[in-house]
Amino acid sequence: MAFSASLFRTKTVHTEDALCPRSAIQAEQPPNIIDCIPVAGYEAALVTNALFLLVLFVFNPLTCKGNWIKAILFYSLLLYNMILAIFLVIDTQHFVSALLLAYVVTFLILWTADRVRLSCAVGSVLPFVDMRSSYIRVDNGNSSVVVPMNHTKHWFIRNFEQSCHCENCFYIHSSSYVECTFISRLKKSILVSVCDFSLGGNVSTVFVPSSDKTVPLHIIAPSKLYV
């Protein structure tokens, strides 16, 4: 229903019909006649935005595929509002369309600036298709790879069984590291190997931030590591 163009087509009504606010009255028309979009159109747009935003805030996937779906939902919301704003411009609803365009453009600028900054930091376009904001970048001398992380703590444990089935995840857990870096919105830390331990027949390595100071280390050995 919210995607039906008929909901947003203007209708000419008498002012006493109260289908839309009086601010929509056009100067060239008689005082008792107005062109407006029915209230149902605005309600549909608000409900659609509310549902999309609710899903984006509540949906917190642990896997790469889930985060790609979340990114698609986000871009779909921006596209929906952009198309709606263009449709309102065509129907001469300039005030409402201007507000909607300002909302979309402002949101898009802030999002793009954040993603560009992260992309430059990690050296990959992955932040544009993955909604997470913490990444591990590893370099084995011949090549490097970036893997998004669910947690915001700058530590990393490799060689655990994990539910992420991306090729990058398997690469990062089998690679011999030359450099390992944790990158997020607020910090960029070089990680160093501090200890190895055996779990389920697999030898795992703990990485923590490189620091001259004492680094608190708390290891809880899970059966799975989500990345």
UniProtKB/Swiss-Prot annotation:
Its main location: host cell. Residues 134-191 form the CoV 3a-like viroporin CD domain. GO terms for cellular component: host cell membrane; membrane. The chain crosses the membrane at residues 39-59, 71-91, 93-113. It is a multi-pass membrane protein. Residues 27-130 form the CoV 3a-like viroporin TM domain. It is found in: Host membrane. Keywords: Host membrane, Membrane, Transmembrane, Transmembrane helix. This is Non-structural protein 3d. It comes from Bat coronavirus 133/2005.
